UniProtKB/Swiss-Prot annotation:
Gene source species: Neisseria meningitidis serogroup B (strain ATCC BAA-335 / MC58)
PROSITE patterns: OMPA_1, OMPA_2
Effect of gene knockout: No visible phenotype when deleted in strains CCUG 37602 / M1080 / Serogroup B / Serotype 1 and 8765 / Serotype 15.
Top-level taxonomy: Bacteria, Pseudomonadati, Pseudomonadota, Betaproteobacteria, Neisseriales
Pfam families: OmpA
Name by which UniProt lists this protein: Outer membrane protein class 4
């Protein structure tokens, strides 16, 4: 009787433990220690599996039942942003050089004076520089004389100066010439007022002479130059003690 009770007690204990293991097994697929909550291993270090074990869904790497997921490939380095080269629009500088007709021509003439040749040669050297983009030669006259006559005279003078500059090395492709006659005469009213102040005692000839002298700035050739602004890169100087 006693032996049968002991066996019954052992059987109940086994059932109880089996129920507990089964409860754990349905979740883990392995026999799990109730105390440490870790998978139980045998003497060979192997994980104990139970009847509920499914290798495909429950296999563990530490038990040798699953392959560790490969390390994720590192994210590739982002490609550097392309370097955008912004072409800067060229900067221009405009300049006007006024040449007095008195230094270039005789009164009412369109042939260059001898001294004017030397001045134009120096100017041509400057206009031949590579940064010079365009040269516009404008002929101007004073208001005296007819519009038609002044227009023709201003054109002849502009062409004479332009041709001289070309003969001294200025590329013909960058130079142009135009006559503007008396259209930009600026001294007329001022000079007429000045001559009027001379009074009745001054002869007409003297007044005319004074007027011609006064309006001289209107008799001119303007050389209009457009150049590209060049940026000079100054090299750094190393200062050494000698």
């Amino acid at each position: 009787m006693t032996k049968q009770l002991k066996l019954s007690a052992l059987f109940v204990a086994l059932l109880a433990s089996g129920t507990a293991v089964a409860g754990e097994a349905s979740v883990q697929g392995y026999t799990v220690s109730g105390q440490s909550n870790e998978i139980v291993r045998n003497n060979y270090g192997e994980c104990w599996k139970n009847a509920y074990f499914d290798k495909a869904s429950q296999g563990r790497v530490e038990c040798g039942d699953a392959v560790a997921a490969p390390e994720p490939e590192p994210e590739p380095e982002p490609a550097p942003a392309p370097v955008v080269v912004v072409e800067q629009a060229p900067q221009y500088v405009d300049e006007t050089i006024s040449l007095s007709a008195k230094t270039l021509f005789g009164f009412d003439k369109d042939s260059l004076r001898a001294e004017a040749q030397d001045n134009l040669k120096v100017l041509a050297q400057r206009l031949s520089r590579t940064n010079v983009q365009s040269v516009r030669v404008e002929g101007h006259t004073d208001f005296m004389g007819s519009d038609k006559y002044n227009q023709a005279l201003s054109e002849r003078r502009a062409y004479v100066v332009a041709n001289n500059l070309v003969s001294n090395g200025v590329p013909v492709s960058r130079i142009s010439a135009v006559g503007l006659g008396e259209s930009q005469a600026q001294m007329t009213q001022v000079c007429e007022a000045e001559v009027a102040k001379l009074g009745a005692k001054v002869s007409k000839a003297k007044k005319r002479e004074a007027l011609i002298a006064c309006i001289e700035p209107d008799r001119r050739v303007d050389v209009k130059i457009r150049s590209i602004v060049t940026r000079q890169v100054v090299p750094a100087h190393n200062h050494h003690q000698h």
